[in-house]
């Protein structure tokens, strides 16, 4: 049996989807263990509020209109705020989980989970415990670029430079079909499904390496 909290847990919410924001507010308020102190549609709105009104716990969507949940985590850590972040996301990629954990998330809950999972994650984090899904430690230490061949690294750099498949084929001396074949292998190794996601991952890793 879960011991009662001495006082209500103060929670803020930030998500780009108004339906999610309203649903989370209703879920938390009806439970009785929580109070909702702020609801925000963007990362900047949340960060501006935290500068003047610190909050104990924030439930943060990963994909925000102006930044990612990872950016929020980085800013909170940089400012040394005592706010504890729970990432609540529909993103299922291992890279998102890896980034969230390495950036200091206290909790990570998929939007496909039952509501009770999120509520118990909030309680655990409020009590000073991490609430993270099981993850192999090798995953956290794994650099997804390490498994790429020289050709795949070359292709990733070309994608980051905005090259089309035709330009890549012309400049590397391989056929367009061969380019497509290498790109499919590249996406599989990176755990992404398209070039936009591959470029975003490439930029994120390079940015982290130069911090």
Curated annotation (Swiss-Prot):
It comes from the Bacteria. InterPro entries: CheY-like_superfamily, Sig_transdc_resp-reg_C-effctor, Sig_transdc_resp-reg_receiver, Tscrpt_reg_LuxR_C, WalR-like, WH-like_DNA-bd_sf. It holds the Pfam family GerE. Residues 165-184 bind DNA. The keyword Ligase does not apply. The modification 4-aspartylphosphate is found at residue 15. This is Probable transcriptional regulatory protein SgaR. It comes from Hyphomicrobium methylovorum. The gene is sgaR.
């Amino acid at each position: 049996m879960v011991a009662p909290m001495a006082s209500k847990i103060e929670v803020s919410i930030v998500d780009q989807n108004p339906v999610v924001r309203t649903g989370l507010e209703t879920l938390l308020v009806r439970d009785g263990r929580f109070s909702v102190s702020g609801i925000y549609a963007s990362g900047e709105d949340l960060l501006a509020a935290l500068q003047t009104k610190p909050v104990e716990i924030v439930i943060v969507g990963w994909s925000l209109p102006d930044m990612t949940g990872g950016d929020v985590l980085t800013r909170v850590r940089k400012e040394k705020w005592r706010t504890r972040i729970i990432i609540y996301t529909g993103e299922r990629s291992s890279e998102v989980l890896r980034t969230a954990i390495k950036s200091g998330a206290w909790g990570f809950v998929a939007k496909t989970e039952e509501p009770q999972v999120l509520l118990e994650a909030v309680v655990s984090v409020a009590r000073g415990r991490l609430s993270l899904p099981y993850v192999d430690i090798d995953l956290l230490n794994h650099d997804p670029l390490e498994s790429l061949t020289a050709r795949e690294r070359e292709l990733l750099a070309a994608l980051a430079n905005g090259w089309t498949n035709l330009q890549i084929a012309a400049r590397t001396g391989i056929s367009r079909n061969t380019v497509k074949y290498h790109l499919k292998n590249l996406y599989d190794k990176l755990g992404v499904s398209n070039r936009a996601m591959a470029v975003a991952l490439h930029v994120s890793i390079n940015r982290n390496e130069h911090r």
